[in-house]
Amino acid sequence: MRRESKQMTIFRSGDQPPGWCELTDFEFVDLTDQPLPIPLAAEKQRLLVTSGSCCVRSAEGAQVLSEGQFLDMDGANGPFTADAGEGAAQVLVFYGRWGNELGGCGVFKLGPDTPVPVRGDPVNYPKSTNFDSHYHDCDEYWVIIEGAGTVVVGSRSFEVEVGDCVAIGMGHHHDLSEVWSDVKGAYFETTLEGRKRFGHLWEHTHGPADVRPERV
């Protein structure tokens, strides 16, 4: 049985996320030179490479992917296997029920930094990074791959570490305000809603956020 997340906004692989989440689970998979089956286990599934390069094989053929690239795993094209060739690689598999119009997906890195003027919205909390406070016209999920720091979502802040997934509801401002050790993370912006704008949005440029208050 999957356990309930201890915090509404942060969950880990195998936890039960909040009911509003389109991301229902995630899993890290380490790859070697031996082909490894990647089972289809959800309505929607996406494989994101988080380190190295790998080759994903399916009924459609083979696709080589490098860090930051992803592949949507359509059940009609299964079964799927993946290997890292002569090297090593890690992939992150997202499971869920998102739609067809999506935001961005990839890998980000952030270290301790002296704040510099950024295009984000103004903040009133301690901040030591040049990451910008912003919102989206979709939900977003951050999975911490390396490092630790402080994430701010709306009026709440959370300490995050390796293996944490931060679920960020549509319209809620969010920020990676402090980093205790260099952070590497994966991000996935799921179904676009409302005005369906993509990318980082700021109230001083794009107008008031379309906040979904129940998504906390």
From Swiss-Prot:
Residues 125-176 form the Cupin type-2 domain. Signal peptide: none annotated. Pfam families: Cupin_2. Keywords: Plasmid. This is Uncharacterized protein y4oW. It comes from Sinorhizobium fredii (strain NBRC 101917 / NGR234). The lineage of its organism: Bacteria, Pseudomonadati, Pseudomonadota, Alphaproteobacteria, Hyphomicrobiales.
